[in-house]
Amino acid sequence: MRNTLLKRMQLALVAMACSCYTLNATVTDYTKGLSIWFDTPNTLQNRAIWYDGRPDLWQGKKKPISAGDTATNPDQSWESQSLPIGNGSIGANIMGSIEAERITFNEKTLWRGGPNTSGGADYYWNVNKQSAHVLDEIRQAFVDGDEKKAALLTRKNFNSEVAYESWAEKPFRFGNFTTMGEFYVETGLSTIGMSEYKRILSLDSALAVVQFKKDGVAYERDYFISYPKNVMVVRFKANKPGKQNLVFSYMPNPVSEGKMEADGTNGLVFKGVLDNNNMEYVVRIQATHKGGTLCNKNGKLSILGADEVVFLITADTDYLINFDPDFKDPKAYVGVNPSETTEAWMKAASAMGYEALFNEHYQDYAALFNRVNLTLNEETATENIPTPQRLKNYRQGKQDFYLEKLYYQFGRYLLIASSRPGNLPANLQGIWHNNVDGPWRVDYHNNINVQMNYWPAASTNLAECTLPLIDFIRTLVKPGEKTAQAYFGARGWTASISGNIFGFTTPLASEDMSWNFNPMAGPWLATHVWDYYDYTRDKKFLKEIGYDLIKSSAQFAVDYLWKKPDGTYTAAPSTSPEHGPIDQGTTFVHAVVREILLNAIDASKVLGVDKKERKQWEEVLAKLAPYKVGRYGQLMEWSKDIDDPKDEHRHVNHLFGLHPGHTLSPVTTPELAKASKIVLEHRGDGATGWSMGWKLNQWARLHDGNHAYKLYGNLLKNGTLDNLWDTHAPFQIDGNFGGTAGVTEMLMQSHMGFIHLLPALPDAWKNGELNGVCAKGNFELNISWKDGELAQVDILSKNGGACEVRYKDVVTTVKTVKGKTYKLAYQNGKLVLQK
């Protein structure tokens, strides 16, 4: 019944999206679906933010090489008022001004830095310090009680010379994700006499829409980015003929050189080269129109008197992902001809027409997004009001279950839009950035942020969206082997705090080891490889790709550890990311080591390989320094009991074993779970957006639904911008994904080897359904509850095998057959298998 209903909804949406796109048709109200929307337009204060309205000032040496590198985005309307669309490769933000549409544009591989700067390949790759020999001296200092010496030796030897800021070295080798420019479509209109304005992002169809009326005319603009065709589609129309008088122009990335040329009678092509590393990029535009005239002159497309205009836009760079880079080749990551790829994409897209492009886009997107549906107390009517007003009301204490559902599904939307197979993973801002440079280089931050991006992927039925992350991990292995050997004398591979698209695995120049010393980056990333297998049970993937990544990461973890004279294994030196001193055994590092070794053991058993190595992993696990409880009853963060109960630091690293790991649990380690709860109570319920997202997951793992719900509310109230983007500040996308993952954790968990139903259901969510979520073991679930208790769960077994299910203290095991659905109802205190 549910699948039939969803199919009808899909068909209705397609019909609604297509049939209404004719002149004089009724305007569709997209706000009635699952949508984020505004009722006031953005003002067009200036053209591209980096020019500050004066492009003549940014010539030659005055180019803004570090513009945007601030904690506060200088373009606040972009950060909190724009609507993001994307297909995993191309991203755009819709501003929705009346006078001119401003669209910021991104292509995920447009990066500065790498081996192809003027410094050459050796300048980029030959940056690891040969520090492994210092480890013995550091560890002896710990034995002697000389912690200052141990810390000094670590600071001086476990960094590099690579700067993290573009202004700090020339050429800038680490690099950063950078804008591909902006598009402007001048309309000749003004806000005078404008009414009924709406700027909408429909999550149901991944379609952005701007609607308004002026002088008796209903105007509409539609925007989407097709994954099948890799093209952005923008349409301008009205309910009266001849109303489209448009001038389309493009402002390229300001730290590049290039040339705009006509591409036929109705198209433009810009071919550019980044100043920093000579990365080539191409932006290709084509316009079609019904009625009126089109003039292609001076790098602009001018349309007069048209009934409807459609712009197609595509882009690419010369970047080619490389799992086996030649460290002597400056062009190791060059291998694509963007002129050819964009020409082929444009040819394919332009042959289809708007309706066919939208239908294909919708079917592709809906096949992913519609897998999961969340209902929260839906019998409660909800007022249809703009999203900023919803947030304002929510902050003032008004309950809004629609907003809570919307935020959950927005996280899934963002993951689909920023991470699709065949490209790179979502970065600190997903795929969206509006400036030359940005906070933390808009990079791949490996001490929680990129990992958090993928917490909701498999559990919310988007496992394939994890594949870009796995490909990214594969790019780190060969460079990471050099880093592991140079700094730790270790086998295997690892990474450090920050990654780019050019295989960077080395620590940066800073001597602040609280953040720059992060050898667990590699093992933490590798746990996602096992998670992908555990959800999908794709044994072919594990054998051909996954196992080697996991095994080599486990080898690094073992070699990194210090076997103390008493036979205990500990991590020295180690840190708790971004917090506290250099230590001889932080809880965080030990928890990550436990996780990757358990993953490696399980993977080797699945494949029936490496019994000898498996035995070593098991022996190290048995002798790894255990969790410790401190004087306040808290789980200790460091090897010494120095935790401060007034410390509200955003990172809760020592609870890694609780979440995202699985070595702490109220079910298996109840005393340590109590100690974990004390940590969370000490840390408080505030902090940055992503931190609240993490704490939400941790409270859910403690089975405290009401406290988890409080964190979810705090995330929405205090860590969310008007367009529902997460903010640190500034905008950081990881909190969105952490929030979505946390809601799933409240309603279903499977990390402990069994399916736990409604483990952290809050009192506020009395009735509801969560359909389509996935559990480890390759099970898909439809869960319903009523009056605060489980009603029924449908379990689709996609792989077969035993399925253990827990609700409250009731446990049952179902022997499943691949492809069959099993229904369990909660009746009279028992889980009853329905026939």
Each language-model region and where it sits:
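Non-catalytic carbohydrate-binding regions of carbohydrate-active enzymes
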Residues: 530-537, 541, 545, 553-563, ...
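Extracellular/periplasmic, surface-exposed regions of secreted and cell-surface proteins
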Residues: 507-523, 527, 535, 554
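Well-ordered alpha-helical segments within folded domains of soluble proteins
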Residues: 447-458, 519-530, 588-598, 653-662, ...
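Aromatic-residue-lined binding/catalytic grooves and analogous aromatic/hydrophobic interfacial grooves
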Residues: 26-513, 531, 551, 564, ...
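Bacterial Sec-dependent N-terminal signal peptides
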Residues: 1-26
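Acidic/histidine-rich catalytic neighborhood
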Residues: 552-606
